[in-house]
Amino acid sequence: MLSASLWPTSVEAKAQAPEATAVDAVVKHYAALVHANYEDSVTSAKTMQKAIEAFLAKPSDKAFLEARKQWLAAREIYGQTEAFRFYGGPIDGEDGPEGQINAWPLDEAYIDYVDGDDNAGLINDANVPMTVEQLAEMNERGGEENISTGWHAIEFMLWGQDFSDNGAGNRAYTDFVDGERANADRRRQYLKLVTQLLVDDLQSLVDAWAPGKADNYRADFEKGGLESVRKIIVGVGSLSRGELAGERIEVAMNTQDQEDEHSCFSDNTHRDAVTNAQGIQNVWLGTYQRLDGSKMVGASLADLVATKNPALAKKTTKQIAESLAAAEGIQTPFDREILGDASAPGRKRLQRTVDSLTAQSKDLVEAAGAIGITKLTLTEPE
């Protein structure tokens, strides 16, 4: 979940804007890349859904582990899409589903039983109707940690609370078996519904970015010229500093509390960092490795900046690659990496990632100036 302030950053334009045809090529390829990434996210989420429904139909330890495996696989795709946020697009505009898809951290007791309270959560409250509409209505009701939907609600159902510094949560599959844990039927129903809602929300993003439609977001975005390029840079710049470096790494470093991990139940936070960094690189270079193994390549921000300042484009490309490498160097479990003082190896790895992401956000602001974009509003940590 984003809880950050807006930081207006002004840069002097060093050159005139690039040719309109070059700008349009970048904007159109970006739109195609966004659509492809969301399309793959739906596909992988449906694979996860199939595994979850197979488990719910016949609960077993093997089926439970398969559902977890498919959640992790689907996150690899979704994490890259976070580079498309922060400019009021379909994902997080006024009516966007981001808070329903990926809100965190969540209060486990809002959903289900927790250590010390077997009756906690909406699952154990028979007065709460089990419908998609009700779950959506309850999301963030009464507090931003009252999360009832999305990736992390599903994650909590699959792993349960994490009490270990050395591993993930270890919810028993028998929580979903009648007679083994109270309200197992509601637990099954909840997991099925919250998974369907996630798939539906992701599909709405595919539709918003679908080609060939006259009245969706993509149709207007592709006509936006340099304003659309500004939005693209706001997205990757804000994810670089405000969200990934700030909210997702620095906050946990400061508190040294595993509750501030992004994916704390599954211990997948290290991969969240990598996929976010990969998403930024995808946008900058105009490349994307699809779920089927094919690779998209096209006009990119890097190409556009290189027409005005080749050295800056090269520098930014190098810095973004360094950030991805630093993120890949973060070890698991993340809740061990955040412990200790500044000299601890894990904290050094995290700080290296933060420093690189901070540097690349500055490069991106400079890159915007090089192509005639004089003002940006990036997200900064509070």
Q: What would you call each of these model-derived segments?
A:
Residues W7-K14:
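Sec/Tat signal peptide C-region and signal peptidase I cleavage site
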Residues Q16-E382:
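Mature extracytoplasmic or organellar-lumen-exposed domains after removal of signal/transit peptides
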Residues M1-S5:
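Bacterial N-terminal signal peptides
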